């Protein structure tokens, strides 16, 4: 009588192997999704100095996002990461399409730091965000990861007396301090910014109108002017 044992063993191996493969595939997907470069395919750009809120979180915690020290050492980044990890991973992709230059009219007060993107609302929250110390005149450095170029940058600064620890940024508590012209496509752009006599803790709000299409980016950077 012919034995069927080898055939049964094959079925058992396949039945055991399939769940194992599914588990491994799921684990790989989760790991890749948590890598700091997971959003790099959506490459765009951001202000790297003074670092925007999302970029500062990624720069400080991207390689150690599971470190429990983040909760106590950098509570605003911790809250942002808990609310949506993608806020930190995709620091370069805070954009909206089709604003046709109407960014102020189409961005409500209190939503400037997130570019009115609900997924990034944690960036609007007032609190102890890490601040970059700058002089009253400093060089803003922008990293255009995809070399989109710029139609313009507009730089705003909160008014004297504004408290980043308790107030959201709105159009009524910022002033336009710098407007640039066009920049050809390149990865690194820098220009001078004067803080117009302000001192202490402030929020720098930057608007970038990319040249390659109707895309508008907005970010907040926390600064300490000395």
What does each model-found stretch correspond to?
Residues 135-139, 188-190, 218:
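Intrinsic-disorder/low-complexity, polar/charged segments enriched in Ser/Thr/Lys/Arg/Asp/Glu/Gln
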Residues 161-162, 195-200, 226:
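A short, structured loop/turn motif at beta-sheet edges
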Residues 158, 198-213:
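Internal, hydrophobic beta-strand segments that form the core of beta-sheet-rich folds
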Residues 218-226:
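Extracytoplasmic/periplasmic copper-protein system
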Residues 167-194:
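Extracellular carbohydrate recognition and processing domains
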Residues 2-43:
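Secretory targeting and sorting signals
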Residues 44-148, 152-168:
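N-terminal "mature-chain" segments and other terminal, solvent-exposed stretches
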Residues 37, 149-151, 198-202, 217:
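Short loop/turn segments at connectors of secondary-structure elements within structured domains
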């Amino acid at each position: 009588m012919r034995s069927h044992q080898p055939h049964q063993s094959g079925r058992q191996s396949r039945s055991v192997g399939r769940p194992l493969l599914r588990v491994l595939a799921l684990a790989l997907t989760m790991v890749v999704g948590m890598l700091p470069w997971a959003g790099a395919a959506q490459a765009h750009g951001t202000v790297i100095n003074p670092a925007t809120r999302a970029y500062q979180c990624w720069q400080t915690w991207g390689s150690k996002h599971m470190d429990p020290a983040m909760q106590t050492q950098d509570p605003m980044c911790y809250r942002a990461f808990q609310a949506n990890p993608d806020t930190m991973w995709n620091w370069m992709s805070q954009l909206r399409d089709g604003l046709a230059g109407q960014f102020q009219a189409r961005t409500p007060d209190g939503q400037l730091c997130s570019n009115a993107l609900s997924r990034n609302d944690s960036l609007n929250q007032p609190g102890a965000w890490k601040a970059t110390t700058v002089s009253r005149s400093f060089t803003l450095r922008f990293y255009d990861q995809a070399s989109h170029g710029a139609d313009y940058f507009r730089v705003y600064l909160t008014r004297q007396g504004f408290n980043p620890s308790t107030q959201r940024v709105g159009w009524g508590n910022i002033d336009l301090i710098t407007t640039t012209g066009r920049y050809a496509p390149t990865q690194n752009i820098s220009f001078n910014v004067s803080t117009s006599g302000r001192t202490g803790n402030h929020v720098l709000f930057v608007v970038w109108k990319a040249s390659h299409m109707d895309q508008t980016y907005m970010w907040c950077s926390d600064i300490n002017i000395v």
